[in-house]
Amino acid sequence: MKPEVAILRLEDLCARSEQCTSDLQRKLSNWGISKSDSEKIISHLIDNRFVDNNRYARAYVRDKYRFSGWGRQKIIAGLYSKRIDKSIIEEALSEINLKEYASIAFRAIASKLRQLPDELSRADKRQRLIRFAASRGFEIALIIKILDSDRLWHSSTT
């Protein structure tokens, strides 16, 4: 593919959805674009505000915690895998509404609790819920706080 065609395709892609530079570099590499041309294309996209890692990180954080029900740890891992700078990640994470975040964690844990067999002991349920919530990326301190709340155990029976 010619670099001119690649620019047009990436501009179209970036106009439709947020992208990060590492994803675009991977696409360019897959299309057989040379490293030097890739760098020029990425610079063009940044200069013309088609791509912005700050904007991408904020959208990623917002989507993953609100719509996918992910915790901070899983979001951080996802952004690191996209090679987003730590400072950008921290800034994006600071926009999380802590009340909403705790509510999302509570709902995820309560939903999982309702799926667990009744014959399991409370300790076994606790262990499974900790593993579940940790795999979703929620912090252990938040998980324990939710598991220690009477509201969780009473809401699962209704």
Where are these regions (language model features)?
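An alpha-helical, amphipathic repeat domain used for nucleic-acid recognition
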Residues: 1-158
